[in-house]
Design a protein with these regions (language model features):
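Polar-ligand-bearing catalytic/cofactor-coordination segments
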Residues: 1-21, 36, 40-42, 47, ...
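Short, hydrophobic transmembrane alpha-helix segments
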Residues: 27-39
């Protein structure tokens, strides 16, 4: 197995484990508040599915609207279209809709519920900053998100996380038949810790999908160093030119639009750039 396939496979296994953990947490919290009542648990399941349905079908429109992205034609951005057309052919994907975000910070994201209904948005800053090869690396990363259906994975994770938070609140306010001090402490602990645990797991899933997209992007463009170099320049650009971003859209971007350090790293949607670059440069022998 090549280094690229090993990296992608490893990220997939870790994502599966994290998704199972998140689902298990939902089942445990649902059982606590329902007292094992099947009807109540089905109600909570329906709530989570409704959130997921909305996220799946409308998240692309919301993301593009929140970012201020504007459709761009081939005559307006010929190099962008040329690069995406070449990379989609190599990846076996249909051509996504292309957008430009009128922001100076260099950044990009992909969205859409499946490859046939996908879009790639790049900022004005990234078009001005990166070389052609670096831009191809970034675009290949975003196309990998589309190929891997990461938007669906994140939608499911977000839906489960939202359901856990909602159920935790319900557990606190509705309480249970057991009014002993120990039961009350348990309810309070669940209310405080369950949403935090769900968020940490969601962020870990997001980080694993970024690693997988880096590996897949390196394979599609055929040059891991192009993506590694781009990531370093994008991180510098994000620091130098902050971008106002709705926090809900932050996980979509290839690099975090703003930095988080220390314990905040647990809640980061993106792995450290230095680790991403290190992994990409380890792939060079297998793709060279």
């Amino acid at each position: 197995m090549t280094t690229t396939k090993q990296s992608t496979f490893g990220a997939t296994i870790r994502t599966t484990i994290l998704m199972a953990s998140l689902s298990g947490l939902l089942v445990v919290i649902g059982a606590l508040i329902s007292g094992g009542n099947p009807s109540t648990m089905l109600l909570f399941l329906g709530f989570a599915l409704a959130i997921n349905f909305f996220s799946y079908f409308f998240s692309d429109k919301m993301a593009l609207a929140m970012s201020g992205a504007k459709p761009v034609t081939e005559s307006e951005a010929p190099k962008l279209y040329e690069a995406v057309r070449e990379l989609t052919a190599r990846a076996g994907l249909p051509m996504p809709r292309l957008y430009v975000i009128p922001q100076d910070q260099p950044n990009a994201f992909a969205t859409g519920r499946n490859p046939k209904h996908s879009a790639v948005a790049v900022t004005r800053g990234i078009l001005n900053l990166l070389s052609d090869d670096e831009l191809r690396g970034v675009l290949a990363h975003e196309l990998t998100h589309i190929r891997n259906r990461d938007i669906l994975i994140q939608s499911v994770a977000s839906a489960i996380g939202a359901a856990i938070t909602y159920i935790a609140y319900m557990l606190l306010w509705l309480g249970s038949d057991d009014n002993s001090p120990l039961a009350l402490v348990g309810q309070l602990a669940t209310f405080l810790l369950a949403p935090i645990a769900a968020t940490i797991i969601q962020m870990a899933i997001s980080r694993q999908r970024e690693y997988a997209a880096d590996a897949g992007g390196a394979e599609i463009c055929g040059n891991p160093e192009s993506l590694a170099s781009a990531l370093l320049r994008l991180e510098q650009g994000a620091t130098a030119k902050p971008m106002q971003v709705n926090q809900a859209a932050e996980p979509l971007y290839i690099v975090k639009p703003f930095s988080s350090k220390g314990i905040a790293g647990l809640f980061s949607t993106h792995p450290p750039i230095e680790e991403r670059v290190k992994r990409l440069r380890q792939m060079r022998p297998s793709l060279g």
